[in-house]
Amino acid sequence: MQQNTSATAQPGSTVDAAEIAKFSKLSAEWWDPKGKMAPLHRINPLRLGYIRDAACRKFERNVRSLNCLGGLRVLDIGCGAGLLCEPLSRLGAQVIGVDPSQSNIAAAKLHADKSHLAIDYRCTTVEEIDPRERFDIVLAMEVVEHVVDVGVFLKRCAAMLKPNGLMVVSTLNRNWKSFALAIVGAEYVLRWLPRGTHEWNKFVTPDELTKYLLDNRLVITEQTGVVYSPFADKWTLSSDMDVNYMVVAEGMV
């Protein structure tokens, strides 16, 4: 598997210091739907619905219930300023959001306070979480393409799942199509994202991600591509996993 060799991390950590600095600069703009985080705001309803539906199937909940995730302990790794944490909390989940950027966590706490939501935000890394903690759901959304060692990162994520828990991972495939659309198109032509947001050699193919998850005794239950329609100006689920995709995996009992 191709690994990025230019990234820098503290010993024992999968966090890339350059990636933290990159996203820390955007902390003040996370909640602006028309700002530099606009692409995340556009895709967020789709991500939320996919996670909610997968969780309701797994834990036999009524997806129509306003409290459908009630009582479930959810860990959102690389939560940024809480774009996913807040709607998950509104669905009843006990949400723990972690991010290594102090400015991101500060922005998340401020927005949650204004929204009167009790979310446990922590400025920390996945390696620093108490190894005795366990979660019903672990989320790694648009994170694995920013870490130093994907295998080590996912091993730690899997270790925090409760028996038969649920993990959802979203990331970018590594091929010429993803380079053309996710980097050249999104960062240079359309300018949806600041230049340098992504490094193509850190993208992860579905086969690579599958192997990482299977190596950690996780069973993949579903996967889907995510595509953008410029005519409808919205994201939809698709069988096309060439660029953006999501994977759901379950821990073995």
Curated annotation (Swiss-Prot):
Q: Does the keyword Transport apply?
A: no
Q: Which domain of life is it from?
A: Bacteria
The EC number(s) this enzyme carries:
2.1.1.222, 2.1.1.64
- Pathway participation: Cofactor biosynthesis; ubiquinone biosynthesis
> Which catalysed reactions does the entry list for this protein?
a 3-demethylubiquinol + S-adenosyl-L-methionine = a ubiquinol + S-adenosyl-L-homocysteine + H(+); a 3-(all-trans-polyprenyl)benzene-1,2-diol + S-adenosyl-L-methionine = a 2-methoxy-6-(all-trans-polyprenyl)phenol + S-adenosyl-L-homocysteine + H(+)
InterPro entries on file: SAM-dependent_MTases_sf, UbiG_MeTrfase
- Its EC top class is transferase
Give binding positions for S-adenosyl-L-methionine: R47, G78, D99, M141
Task: Name any Gene Ontology BP term.
Answer: methylation
A Gene Ontology molecular function term for this protein is:
polyprenyldihydroxybenzoate methyltransferase activity
Q: Which UniProt keywords apply?
A: Methyltransferase, S-adenosyl-L-methionine, Transferase, Ubiquinone biosynthesis
Signal sequence interval, chain numbering: none
Disulfide linkage:
none
Checking NCBIfam families in the record gives: UbiG
Family affiliation: Belongs to the methyltransferase superfamily. UbiG/COQ3 family.
Tell me, in a sentence or two, what this protein's role is: O-methyltransferase that catalyzes the 2 O-methylation steps in the ubiquinone biosynthetic pathway.
Protein name, UniProt field = Ubiquinone biosynthesis O-methyltransferase
